[in-house]
A protein has these predicted regions:
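Short, low-complexity intrinsically disordered segments
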Residues: 10, 20, 76-78, 83
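Short acidic, glycine/serine/threonine-rich loops at helix termini
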Residues: 70-75
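Conserved oxyanion/phosphate-binding beta-strand-loop segments in alpha/beta enzyme cores
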Residues: 2-23
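Glycine-rich beta-strand-to-loop/alpha-helix junction loops that act as flexible
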Residues: 62-66
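N-terminal glycine-rich flavin-associated loop
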Residues: 3, 26-59, 80-100
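Short clusters of hydrophobic/aromatic residues that line enzyme substrate/ligand-binding pockets
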Residues: 22, 68, 88
Length: 100
């Protein structure tokens, strides 16, 4: 896998150490993602979604990683949205979220 078009290599990592850091949550499960991205803005998320749609690689968005059942893990792309996002809004009866 290589850095997708329109995504900065500064926020995209395929380094094993980064991938292993996101292979665990508070559960007993271990899934190693193909890549880790730390999107900084809406454009990064749009580019990531376009890439995932094109390549059919699943994305998991992770904030705290506190799941006890493995929901915050993936063997696809891990999108860590902990830093830089100041506001959120839950939409569509909890089916989506808006981050700013």
């Amino acid at each position: 896998m290589s850095v997708p078009q329109n995504i900065s290599s500064e926020i995209w990592s395929e380094r094993l150490i980064d991938r292993l850091a996101y292979a665990h949550d508070a559960s007993m499960y271990r899934l190693v993602p193909k890549a880790v991205i730390r999107p900084q803005n809406e454009a990064d998320v749009q580019s990531l979604l376009a890439h995932a749609n094109e390549t059919k690689i699943p994305i998991t968005f992770r904030t705290g990683g506190t799941s006890l059942s493995g929901q915050s893990l993936t063997e696809g792309i891990m999108a860590e949205v902990v830093r830089g996002w100041q506001h959120h809004e839950v939409l569509d009866k909890g089916r989506s979220i808006k981050l700013e």
